[in-house]
Swiss-Prot record:
One Gene Ontology cellular component annotation held by this UniProt entry: cytoplasm
Native organism taxonomy: Bacteria, Bacillati, Bacillota, Bacilli, Bacillales
The protein's annotated pathway: Cofactor biosynthesis; (R)-pantothenate biosynthesis; (R)-pantoate from 3-methyl-2-oxobutanoate: step 1/2
Active-site residue list: E179
Name listed for the protein in its UniProt record: 3-methyl-2-oxobutanoate hydroxymethyltransferase
Main location: cytoplasm
CDD domains: KPHMT-like
């Protein structure tokens, strides 16, 4: 398993870090079998798996349920689990209770928290031994306020992002996700920080990349962000399901090859 020291070493060696989301046992197993460096159990599962419009409806219980499944499928991969909206940013007692619960229940390697306003939470969590991955730029939990658009696109906004990146590192964050920001800004932040910086829609100059499993595989998703590249096409599964439906209705499935050869009725009738 790649630990934090190995991820930092990859950054120092300029070896790109690959990260992908996974939400269940089979997707996690696929990621591990493909030698992905990190898995994110993102609250994006609200949209990709649970059918919500945004991530804001995802609960702590949802993250625990899916986080456990991912860990079972990827027992030798660095797994990060999202802290969903409302679980942190309230009070120290409230925040740490939720973080401890999620960390222990999922057996994650780290938790992810959105926003620079959680600097104190990052510091407190680090002090009790829970590694935190910070998330800046576009923050899906705050789309009701900021919307889905490029962040850090003005001088003031860019300077603020740089300050926030340094602040979360100083607070103890073990890595940083930058989403939907100009590529030159992301490259500068990656260069300035000692911790690994993972980009999504942040250009190629970050220390690594993360994509959503369902986006990159065209799996049940109708709309895609500009930064998504489809590396496969799971939508072909629809054709397979249609074919199955046709064969059931035509009576051609199951065929003899899919049927047990054991005959039992003669034995049953002989008891009469």
């Amino acid at each position: 398993m790649k630990n934090l020291a190995k991820l930092v070493e990859m950054k120092q060696d300029k070896t790109k870090i690959s990260m992908i989301t996974a939400y269940d046992f089979p997707s996690a197993k696929q990621a591990q079998d493909a030698n992905i460096d990190m898995i994110l159990v993102g609250d994006s599962l609200g949209m990709t798996v649970l059918g919500y419009e945004t991530t804001t409806q995802v609960t702590l219980e949802d993250m625990i349920h899916h986080g456990k499944a991912v860990r079972r499928g990827a027992d030798d991969t660095f797994v990060v689990v999202d802290l969903p909206i409302g679980t942190v940013g309230v009070s120290d007692e409230h925040d740490l209770k939720n973080a401890i619960t999620l960390y222990q229940e999922t057996n994650a390697n780290a938790l992810k928290a959105e926003g620079a306003h959680l600097v104190n939470f990052i510091k407190k969590s680090t002090q009790i031994g829970i590694p935190i991955v910070a998330h800046l730029g576009l923050m899906p939990q705050s789309v009701g306020v900021m919307g889905y658009r490029l962040q850090g696109s003005t001088k003031d906004a860019a300077e603020q992002l740089i300050q926030e990146a340094h602040a979360v590192q100083e607070a103890g964050a073990v890595a940083l996700v930058l989403e939907a920001i100009p590529s030159d800004l992301a490259g500068l932040i990656s260069e300035q920080l000692d911790i690994p910086v993972i980009g999504i829609g942040a250009g190629k100059d970050t220390d690594g990349q993360v994509l959503v499993y369902h986006d990159m595989l065209n799996y049940g998703v109708d709309r895609y962000a500009k930064f998504v590249k489809q590396f496969g096409d799971f939508s072909v599964g629809i054709d397979a399901i249609k074919h199955y439906d046709e064969e059931v209705k035509a009576g051609t499935f199951p065929a003899e090859a899919h049927t047990y050869k054991k005959k039992i009725l003669n034995e049953v009738n002989s008891n009469d």
